[in-house]
Amino acid sequence: MNALRLLSPAKLNLFLHITGRRADGYHLLQTLFQLLDYGDELYFEIRDHGPITLAPALPSVDFEQNLIIRAARALEPYKPKPLGVDIQLTKRLPMGGGIGGGSSNAATTLVALNHLWQCGLSKQQLQTLGLQLGADVPVFVNAQTAWAEGVGESLQPIEIPPKWFLVVQPDCHVSTAEIFSHGDLTRDTAAIKVAAFLERGGQNDCEVLVRKLYPQVDEALNWLQQFDRHARMTGTGACVFASFDSVEKAQWVQTQLPAHLPGFVAKGVNQSPLYKLLPAS
């Protein structure tokens, strides 16, 4: 095999609790990463020799700083032959939306090139490389909906009943660094067990602050909560979502969206397509 076409899926944080802060400044979290059947698409075609190429280039991102390129570079020391690769990106997910676009692209690249270049790295090794690229990359390498703790690196795969989600994209870019460094952020939520979340749910500890700082997010949530009172923000935003028991209901609500609020409907899945490509050990 010398080529692969893969979905690079989005994720949602079904809840996000900040339970503390380590001495090094990193926040301790609890969250449930829900993978979706919607995302970007990446096509990889191996070259017998030559460089790593990516098309199209993202105009706002330096080539070498693109997470796709950084992931490919991280694997280069492990490839047994001097192979290159041409990568084509079909971008559907917004940048800075809190739904994991860049992190998912990096994870998809790690898993795909480990397979195509025959690098022979284990899933754990790929996750370790991924963590160097971003805190959310390991969950996409893991390729399973998962309960996460610590700084997001402790992952417990979890199977939950399928839901349909309407994800809405407010017209703003939320700075994760700004939110996590803000003095008003809640950092002392009590830790909960999986069973407690499944019974009673949770909240997003970043949401109150983001709604105050970004009126576009507040507006989008106010609109969505007409249809789902549990609608909430994912990650540090800006995207927000509502869940439904049927695709028909999700699509109907999508048709009611105001013209200035784009959105998409996706199904929650317990595994992404990457799962079948992961090494056995």
Curated annotation (Swiss-Prot):
Pfam families (UniProt xref): GHMP_kinases_C, GHMP_kinases_N
Pathway: Isoprenoid biosynthesis; isopentenyl diphosphate biosynthesis via DXP pathway; isopentenyl diphosphate from 1-deoxy-D-xylulose 5-phosphate: step 3/6
Annotated active site: K11, D136
GO molecular function: 4-(cytidine 5'-diphospho)-2-C-methyl-D-erythritol kinase activity; ATP binding
Domain of life per record: Bacteria
ATP-binding found in the keyword field: yes
Binding positions for ATP per the UniProt entry: P94, M95, G96, G97, G98, I99, G100, G101, G102, S103, S104
Entry keyword set: ATP-binding, Isoprene biosynthesis, Kinase, Nucleotide-binding, Transferase
Documented EC number(s): 2.7.1.148
Nucleotide-binding recorded as keyword: yes
GO terms of biological process kind: isopentenyl diphosphate biosynthetic process, methylerythritol 4-phosphate pathway; terpenoid biosynthetic process
Enzyme class: transferase
Reactions the enzyme catalyzes: 4-CDP-2-C-methyl-D-erythritol + ATP = 4-CDP-2-C-methyl-D-erythritol 2-phosphate + ADP + H(+)
Function: Catalyzes the phosphorylation of the position 2 hydroxy group of 4-diphosphocytidyl-2C-methyl-D-erythritol.
PANTHER family, A to Z: 4-DIPHOSPHOCYTIDYL-2-C-METHYL-D-ERYTHRITOL KINASE, CHLOROPLASTIC (PTHR43527:SF2)
HAMAP family: IspE
Family indicated by similarity: Belongs to the GHMP kinase family. IspE subfamily.
Protein name: 4-diphosphocytidyl-2-C-methyl-D-erythritol kinase
Source organism: Cellvibrio japonicus (strain Ueda107)
Taxonomic lineage: Bacteria, Pseudomonadati, Pseudomonadota, Gammaproteobacteria, Cellvibrionales
Gene: ispE
